[in-house]
Amino acid sequence: MSLMYPSVDELLNKVDSRYKLIALASKRAKELEELPRLKDELLKLKREEKPTDRDKKQIQEIAAQLETLVGPTLDNYKSVKPIGRALEEINAGNVQIDPVNKDKSED
């Protein structure tokens, strides 16, 4: 096994440039970090006995954010860090650049 798993060479077979690889991995790692925090915050707000209008608005906002996030896509990870997990998901082909956003960025 190489020093880094997955290797950059393996990853570049999935994404056509180092820049895109870094952008995709960092975005996915942020999502993986954000998901548990948002879930905890939502549960905390829902446990309030008398939620205020502000609490209700926050619940709606968090629920909307959670709808856009995808949870972990692999059953087992070798890495414990979000960036390593993101790279593993990219290598498995579970995370790809959104073609709609890709077209916009190339204009």
UniProtKB/Swiss-Prot annotation:
Gene Ontology BP terms: DNA-templated transcription
Catalytic activity: RNA(n) + a ribonucleoside 5'-triphosphate = RNA(n+1) + diphosphate
Alphabetical UniProt keywords: DNA-directed RNA polymerase, Nucleotidyltransferase, Transcription, Transferase
Keyword Signal recorded: no
The UniProt record lists the keyword Transferase: yes
Family classification: Belongs to the RNA polymerase subunit omega family.
Alphabetical list of HAMAP family matching this protein: RNApol_bact_RpoZ
Function noted in UniProt: Promotes RNA polymerase assembly. Latches the N- and C-terminal regions of the beta' subunit thereby facilitating its interaction with the beta and alpha subunits.
Protein name stated in the entry: DNA-directed RNA polymerase subunit omega
